[in-house]
Regions:
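Acidic, PIN/NYN-like endoribonuclease modules and their adjacent C-terminal/linker elements
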Residues: 1, 100, 104-137
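Short, well-structured N-terminal submotif of metal-dependent ribonuclease cores
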Residues: 1-34, 44-57, 136
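A secondary-structure boundary/capping signal
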Residues: 6-7, 38, 113
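Active-site neighborhoods of divalent-metal-dependent phosphate/nucleic-acid chemistry enzymes
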Residues: 64-111
Length: 137
């Protein structure tokens, strides 16, 4: 596995046929995973039980589970403290920081369309991020 999916990246992927084509091989090879904070965030968009079940099935079929590390809280506190020194600690949500901690722990790159991850990565040297629109880079 190479990438950990963020909801912003998934929304773009699901809505853009060009991105679906560009990332098809990575999805097919199970190179893109998801973690429960991201799935929970995306499942919030389900309009009813049927759609909730469809989304849950999509995650199970396409995006392997990546476990959130037990030490995520320490990583988040450290990074948030560094971000506060430059006044950027409010740029990333709690879910974004959980996803970032999970990616950093597993050595995965966050696949996103969210400038917040670039901000977090400037303060977390063990975090890498990649915008889903940057295909082939």
């Amino acid at each position: 596995m190479i990438y950990l999916l963020d909801t912003s990246g998934l929304v773009r992927l699901l809505s853009d046929p060009g991105l679906q084509e560009a990332w098809y091989d990575a999805v097919d090879a199970e190179a893109i995973g998801s973690c429960y904070p991201q799935r929970t965030e995306f499942l919030y968009t389900a309009r009813d039980g049927s759609e909730f079940d469809e989304i849950t099935e999509m995650f199970g079929d396409l995006y392997p589970d990546v476990s959130v590390p037990k030490n995520a809280g320490r990583w988040i506190a450290s990074v948030q403290h560094l971000m506060a020194q430059t006044g950027e600690h409010r740029s990333a949500s709690a879910v974004d920081l959980m996803i970032a901690a999970t990616a950093a722990h597993h050595g995965l790159t966050i696949l996103h369309d969210d400038a917040d991850y670039r901000t977090v990565a400037r303060h977390a040297l063990d975090l890498s991020e990649h915008n889903i629109h940057d295909v082939g880079r």
